[in-house]
Amino acid sequence: DYKSDMLTLQDKISIGKHWDNQFTYRRNKVKTNYFQDYDMNAQSNWGISSDYTYDIIGEQVSFHDEWNRLTFGVDYSKGRDNVLRAAGFDVNGNPVKTNHWYENYSFYIQEDWNFLPRWSLSGGLRHDRPETDQYTADFSSHTSKSYRLSYEITPKDTVYAGRNDFYILPGLDVLYIPQYGNAKVRPAYGYTDTVGYSHVFSDKTMFTFNWFRTKDEQSIGYDTSSKKYKNFNQGVSRGWNAQLISQIGSKWSANVGWAHLYSNVPGDNFSLGYSPKDKLTFDMIYHNKKFTGGLDGFYFIRRKNPVNSDLKGWPNDKYGIYNLSFNYEPRKDFNFYLKINNIFDKLWAEHTDVIWSDHTPGTWYSMPGRTWLFGVKMEV
């Protein structure tokens, strides 16, 4: 079971021609309850449950003119575990239970500056100052930097390069879920380098290419020996993606992309096949007055891990999923729609038990096969 209740309040105002202000408050309550009986006779039961509350308050101010855009602000966030959990022992040796929590203050500033007609420079700083309860590892404060330089070679060709630091707090489940949580886990941090190029063939067709490399100075992953989350060091991932976007005549549009990923990050699940080594995505849409129809999908190529290459951990390592959609809108307040997902009824999965334990092929979590959805939407 999964239940999420979210409340968001947001206020935006403009002050003159150059200043904007935005205030945001958000509260999200999330409850989950998962149970699995592996052998169908209650001998190998496994389950987890959680109940979290998240509060976020943000205040952002921005200034913009012809050459600059300056954004600065502060965010406050707090996560609280609503379930009493074992937290250790008091000074007298008695067991202690508590509702774990942590909070974070983030202060940031970013400047986008078009300092010459064909040059633009972006730079930013973000300082995080987290605090935890007394039973959780101390999270040290951290300052992240980012910058990017873009150059317009010609009116149709643009190149850019940059670097972005990251600092990611562990989730409440990573810290406190009894089955695999670890209250000693600390935030992940590192940086990503990126280089990109874009070319505009015409006002209707554009090509983009991006290469990236991410280095983890400290990451968070799952340790199969201890069956707990922990921190790892010196992970690296890199890849590229290319995309062609085109408007074909007045009624057709198309988009095709290819992404490639290599990752060597201890404790992640890329080597187990959760993320694709290569992935092709596409869509083609036809629009004519009141009628719209489209075909979209992806082709997935999984990385073969030499360590478990003989284990069939997934239904397929190469597969395509394709979807059709049709919309007819006789008037603005009335719409008929038909969606056919996974039109070839392909067996595929995004999660599996096979690679985590001694389960046999077939103990994966299949995604839906061919599904039909027909409906009518009317606005009053």
Please provide the spans of the model-predicted regions:
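Extracellular loop and loop/strand-boundary signature of outer-membrane beta-barrel proteins
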Residues: 1, 6-10, 38-49, 89-98, ...
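Outer-membrane beta-barrel domain signature, strongest for Gram-negative TonB-dependent receptors
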Residues: 1-80, 194, 203-208
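Repeated loop/turn-to-beta-strand initiation elements of outer-membrane beta-barrel proteins
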Residues: 17-21, 67-70, 118-121, 156-159, ...
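Membrane-embedded beta-barrel scaffold of Gram-negative outer-membrane proteins
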Residues: 17-36, 152, 159-160, 168, ...
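Signature of Gram-negative outer-membrane beta-barrel scaffolds
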Residues: 71-157, 169-170
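Surface-exposed extracellular loop regions of Gram-negative outer-membrane beta-barrel proteins
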Residues: 80-87, 131-137, 143, 151-194, ...
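Gram-negative outer-membrane beta-barrel transporters
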Residues: 114-122, 212-215, 231-308, 344, ...
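Conserved C-terminal beta-signal and adjacent last beta-strands/turns
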Residues: 195, 273-380
